[in-house]
Structure formats: C-alpha cells, structure tokens
UniProtKB/Swiss-Prot annotation:
This is Nuclear pore complex protein Nup75. One of its GO terms (molecular function) is structural constituent of nuclear pore. Keywords: Membrane, mRNA transport, Nuclear pore complex, Nucleus, Protein transport, Translocation, Transport. The gene is Nup75. The keyword Nucleus applies. Component of the nuclear pore complex (NPC) that seems to be required for NPC assembly and maintenance. Required for nuclear import of phosphorylated Mad via importin msk. Has no role in classical nuclear localization signal (cNLS)-dependent nuclear import via importin-beta. Facilitates the interaction between Nup93 and sec13 with msk.
Amino acid sequence: MSDSGVFAFELGDDLATRCGNTLTGVFVPGSRIALSAYRHVTHSSRDEPTENAGQVPVLIYMAQESTLFDEPVLRSVLAEANATFATLQQLGSRATRAEYVNISRAYRSIVRSCLEKLEQAKKSPEVQTDEARLQRLCDAIVVFYAAECLWHLFEILYIQSNQLVVPQLLDWARFHSPHAEDRATDLLLMGEEASESDDYWSIVKSLIMLGEIDVTRAVLSQNRKAGQTSFKAAEQILKSMPVYQEGYALQKFHSQWEFWHVDTERKIQSGLFATEPELEQLIRLVAGDSEQWDAGIKESQDFYEYLPGYLLFTKPTCKPFELKIAAAKWLNRWCLLRPEREQCSMNRMVSQLMDHDLRLFIYDAQKLNDTHWFSTHLIDLIHHCGQLKSYFDQNNIDLPALRHSMIYEYGSYLMTSHNMWQLGIDYLDCCKQEGQAAIELLLPRITLRSERQATKLINLARQRGLISVEREICKVLSKRSYDNERYGNALEWAIRSKDVLLVTAVADFILKHYSKTGCMLCPDTIANVGGRMFASPRLVFLSKYFEFYEFYRTRDFLSASELLVNLLESKITPDYFWPSLLIDSMPLLESKDPKIFAKETVAILHHIETDLVPIIERDVSKYGKHHTETVFKDYRVENVDEIMNLLRLACARNLARALIIENTLPVV
C-alpha cells in the first residue's frame, strides 16, 4: 500500500482556457461540487462584460468523489459491518474482554469474506475485459488487505492483551504472507522430487523465518537425503525446540530453551552440517545467526514479514512492552539492509502499533481510501472496550469526541448515497443532537425512487419526531404525483404534508378543471377526505362542493339545494368558481316544484349582484372585451350577458313560485 499523491486537473473547455484554467466551485447536495470557469476579480477590475461574454457557452461540471463502495461487490461489507456495529452498541461498555474480542473478529471476518469476493470477481471474464473496473477491484483488495492486517495486529496487541505475543504474531505474519506456505504445499505434493526444485531451499528458509516449524519438518522429511545424519540432526533440533504453552512456568521454559539453543550452536560449530551448506544455513537461522537473518531480510518485502519468526528463535517469551524495543531495532536493521525500499504507509502503521504510537496510527488510518470505514469502526471498538482510556487521557485526546466525530462523518457519508442511506441513519442515531440534526437535513435530500421507499422514510422520520422531514417528503411526493397527472395521489400527499398552500393549489386545480370540463378529478380521494378537509379552506370548499355534486347526481335535489345555499353563504368560494356555483343553481331555480325557498332565492340574487357582478366589472375594466376568458371559464358559458339575464330571470320565477306556495294557506 503506497501513499497516494494529490492530483491536479483542469476543465479544458474554451471558456476555462481563456480564463487561464482557473475554477470556481459550489458544494451541492449529494457530496458533489459544481465547477465552472472563473476569472479572478479584484477591487481594480472594471465592472463591464468580458471580451468572451456571449461568445462561448458557460459549462457547469458536476464533480463527485468516487469511492470504493461504488462497486456492488463491496456493499455487503457496509451492511454486515452495520449489524456488528449495532451489536457493539447494545453491549456497551459492560461487556467482557472475550465479547470485545469476538466483535473484533467479526469485523475481521467481514473483511476477509470481502477479500475472497473481490478475488473471485477479479477473475471473472467481464471484469478482465474492463480495465477501469479491474483497477478498482485491485485498489479495493489493497485497501481491505491493509485494513484486515492492521486490525488483526491491533487486536493482538491491544484487545487480547496477552502477556506473551509471539504465538499470535506468528499467526498474523503467516496469514499475511501466504506465498511460502502455498509453495510448501506444492513441494509436499511433489514428494521426493521437490528437493530438485530451484526454489526448494529458498522456500524452506522462508518457512523457517515465518516460524512454520511443523511445515518445514514435513518438507525436509521428503528430501531425498532425509536419511542422512545431518538431516536427522536437523529434524531432531526442530522437533525438540521448546514451545511455550500458557500456564507453563517461565523460568523453567527459559532454562529448557537456553539448553536447546546452546546445544544447537554446539552442533553447528562441530561441523555436523558442513556437508550440506543449505541445511546449515537453515539451522543457523533457527539458532538466530545474524548473518543469515540479514540475508533473509534482504529478500523480504515488508519490514514486519519475518519479525515474528525472528522473535520465535531469539526471544520467544517477548512481552508487549519488549516488542516496542525489538520492533524499533528490527526496523532500523531492515532500513539499513534495504535502503532502496521506501517505507510505505503500511510499514509505517505497523511500526506505530508496535511502538504504541496510537495517535499517529489513528491519523494515518484515516488516510486509507475506504471512506473512514476502518478508522470509524476501530475507534468505536476502542471507545467501548475502554482498555486504552489511560493512553488517550495521558496524550490529551478526547476519545468520546473523536469517536463522535468519526461516526458523524461516516454516517453523513452513507446518508448521501442513495444505496446506503438507511445504514447511515443507524450511525447518526449514535450522535445525539448533532446526529438528529443531520438526519433532519439529509433525509429530505434522498432521491425518492418509489412510494414504498418514501413511506419507509416517513416512518423513520416519525419515529424520531422529525415532523418537518415527514411533511417535506409528502410535499415532494405530492408535486411528483401532480407532474405525473396522478391528481388523487397529489391531493392525498398534499393533505399529509399539512402545507396549506400546497393543499390549496391542488384543490384549485381540481376545481378549475371541473369548471372548464365538467369532469370531477379523483372523486374517490375527495369522497374519503373526511375530517382532513380542514387542512385548507379551499379543500373544505372542494369537499362540500363534491357533496353537492353527489346529491345532484343522485337526484337528491332538496339536500343539494340546501348545501348549495350554504356554500354561497360560506364566504370560502374562490372568485373563479362563482360563475360555476351560480350556474349550478339554475336547474334548481327553474324547477316547477320549488327546491329553493324565497329567502334563499333572495340570497342568491344578492350574491349575483354583490359577488359576481363586481368581479365582472373589475375584469371588464382590466381586460376589456376579453373579460369573458378570465372570469367565465365554465364550460357551460358562451355569452356573459345572456347568462346573467337567465340567472336573474330564473331567480325571479322561482321567487314568485316560492312566495305563492309559502303564503298559501292549506285547505282544511
């Protein structure tokens, strides 16, 4: 893993080139930047159009950061890590060390599974033919390999906190340097012929330097010369090497190990292996010979590759505080022997862990190209297990604040991705007030792909008491349904948004459409509005007019007449609907059997003169002879004057009939 550099770029269009390739940018929702050409202006610049004004188009470029998680194969990492993160929050700070170790291993298991998927995906034909995607997968493998390697080492040194670390370090080194073990498997399958391979001894030496004693013995036992004295002696040395077991007395183990080490040195000095130079070099490695280990260091790729093996043969009971000194010496030795190799960030971070420099380690961990996946989850685990609290206190590091900041940033990143926003909410929920504020800002910006998703968002907002978010989503859905000509849905979502202006606008559209065409839109939705009509006065009018419409359609003229008069008296009739409402009264007024009484008929005449006539006069003065197009938009109207005369005449006739009937005494 190498350090990444800073890349420079330019827009390259005509305007940008003329402006000297200077740019300006504005952040827009979705972690994007809108870039365009820019010419620097100072206090002495003249306030006039530039020479390029109007000559070339102004192009705006939307720049968005690409991340590893844009690759579908990697999204499972986010979901699985989210589940482990939630489990850790439930455990809190009262869990046992074993439970924290299990959580750590769960995170590492997720990464290892991801690496396997990446390796499989990389070998697929469609990826092999797509260079860009192949490069993305290779980059992801490098990043997650580094994350697993560093997490594993951190777990050994700081979460398990064993007194003796060499056995765990050996497992760590073997897993992250599998080449020698893979080749050893090939040699074992070859049998005696393996000893004729050109890389036979280099593989065996690598196995020893990795501490693979049992595998080395198995490979040597198949050598054609395995029956010779020197090979038997080597087998005995490897077999009899003391290995520390937990609970064993340290002093007794040291005595046994010293005896074994001195005996091995004596056999080397006696020339027992002189006839087999390669085997002698191997045994010298086992004895910790500096010259042989220096030769091995020169062949290593990373400084930490053979360090655990060296400790196994020179300091098998190394404790964590001793590892700091041993690792520093080993790194200096490696740098002297490999001066041509620059120390990459991976080597540096391993060194920081072994040197107990967690401040720098956390700083470098945030530079991994994984959108802070590694550093966020690791810091959260550190915070909960509490074993490093004294270290952070001594170094004046506010661990809770650091954790809060990392989780907040990571959760905000997930919230800006249309595929991962639901995971981001779980992280922001851990950030208390700031997290709630972020959710309130980011939830309405999520691209709504379906009403099902919108319902899920609304439920999430409702659970957190984010009423404004719920209403904002409803407004978006209402406007989208309106644009798609789904007016029933538009009205339903508008009512749920409780936005008076939006409800009024949708109701206005339905009323205007009816007055123009005579067709009532979304009758089922209007019929089921019920008590929600009070969201807007216009919706109240629409609901009540729809009731009148239904009474009229079912020929319940008395109820229709009563409701019509109530609407006229309600003072909530919109100006544009007065003509339609009054025209609706004409069939009722012309009925031979009066449906509207004298008092109500006078009221209708009053509304004609005090409400409709002023509207007509106002529009005549404003639009002249075209006023008919602005006031009388009812589909039943052709001539204004004729309709006005018919309305007055219908009122006069109905008034006469009503007065006669109302003032005639019944015959006894």
